[in-house]
Structure formats: structure tokens, C-alpha cells
Amino acid sequence: MFDLKPEEARLLLNIALMAVGGNRFRSAAKILAVLELFRPNHPSVAVAKTVALMSAGDFEAAVAYVDGEALRKFPDSAMLKAFKGMALIRMERKTEALPVLREAARSTDDPAAAKMAEDLLKS
């Protein structure tokens, strides 16, 4: 069986995010789908999938993915919660976003996610 080294996984994740930045959302989705096969228990893939959906402007799909799949797999991911809150804000559903962002802002395991959530709460 083929194995993927951690540095190769990081490289593929970066390539997928570059594809997102270049509006190549289908290419990014394909890369992330393959990466998920090799790293099914790594939250960074779920975060990247969420970012890809949001970057494509599909905030509703991003929230549905986070709620229906990503947070079930990674319930303690403050970054997923912060991005969910951001997507809800973009859909003008700030009332729903506030508790999610407050929870993410309390994270001590992920200072970057906590900071992002705090900044979104101030906006």
C-alpha cells in the first residue's frame, strides 16, 4: 500500500490551498479528497475543505459540511468553529454565529483560532 509522509501531506495541503487562491475549486476539492484518504483523522484537511467552500462563496455548504461532517469528526476543533462562525456572519446570521465564535474564542489549544474568533466577535 502506498503511504504518504507527513511532509508530502503538508505539501499537498498547501497545493490545494493555492488552488483555492487561484479559484480552482474543483482541483482543490480533488486534492483534498485524496488527501483525506491518507489523513482521515487530521483536522487540517477538514479546515481546508471548509476554506475552499467559503472561498467559492458557498457559505451555506461550508456550514452544512462543518455541522454534518467536520465537527462530528473533530468536535474540539476551534478553527472549524471559527470558520463556521465566519460563514454564518457572511450569511448575515450573526445571532447564530455569536455562540459558536465565543466557544472558539475560549480555546486554549489553538491560539490562532481563538484570535480569529475574537476578531470576528469584534466585527
Q: For the regions a protein language model found, what residue spans apply to each?
A:
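TPR/TPR-like (Sel1-like) alpha-helical repeat modules
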Residues: 89-111
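Start-of-helix register in tetratricopeptide repeats
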Residues: 10, 44, 78-79, 112-116
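Short coil turns that delineate tetratricopeptide repeat
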Residues: 40, 74-75, 109
